[in-house]
A protein has these predicted regions:
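Basic, polyanion-binding surface patches
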Residues: 1-162
Length: 162
């Protein structure tokens, strides 16, 4: 997942190959992004299994469903952060010469947000506190974010205003 726009918030992800997830999103026009934490990493990995069409990934991975407020798609109950999204675009990627590749980009506008309040300090989300997991360049490489690796950079335009 990545953030592509702030106002309105638009997030997206790429799917290598046509998967049920992409098909479901295109058919319903909705999806939920669920934060993967260190605690949920193994279950998240289980959701990538190639299951027979119609088999429930939640059940196979030992995850529970929670109702969303705005979209008609369940969210992962165990995830401390969920973004409810409406599909804005989906497209098959192409090479520079226009030849299609077997990867799909899905973009959605965030229309609802759920954040575990224990991850907020003075109304600001504390990323390291959630112990999020991110994919890191290979099919098996992941990293977890921790407070010890945090650093801040002030943008040049913001420095000029001081």
């Amino acid at each position: 997942f990545n953030c592509f726009n702030y106002h309105p918030p638009i997030i997206g992800f790429a799917s290598s190959g046509w998967k049920d997830s992409v098909q479901n999103i295109i058919e319903t026009g909705e999806f939920v992004w669920n934060l993967t934490t260190l605690e949920l990493a193994t279950a998240m990995n289980e959701t990538s299994a190639s299951l027979p069409h119609g088999e429930d990934e939640f059940f196979a991975a030992g995850l529970s469903k929670a109702d969303s407020r705005i979209v008609n798609v369940p969210r992962v109950a165990q995830s401390p952060v969920n973004f409810e999204c409406r599909l804005s675009q989906s497209l098959q990627l192409t090479t520079a010469d226009g030849s299609p590749v077997d990867t799909w980009l899905v973009l959605g506008e965030v229309v609802g947000i759920h954040i575990d309040e224990t991850l907020l300090e003075d109304g600001i989300y504390q990323t390291a506190k959630a112990k999020p997991v991110l994919r890191a360049g290979g099919p098996t490489a992941y990293y977890s974010i921790s407070e010890t690796h945090r650093f801040d950079l002030v943008r040049p335009d913001a420095r000029a205003k001081r």
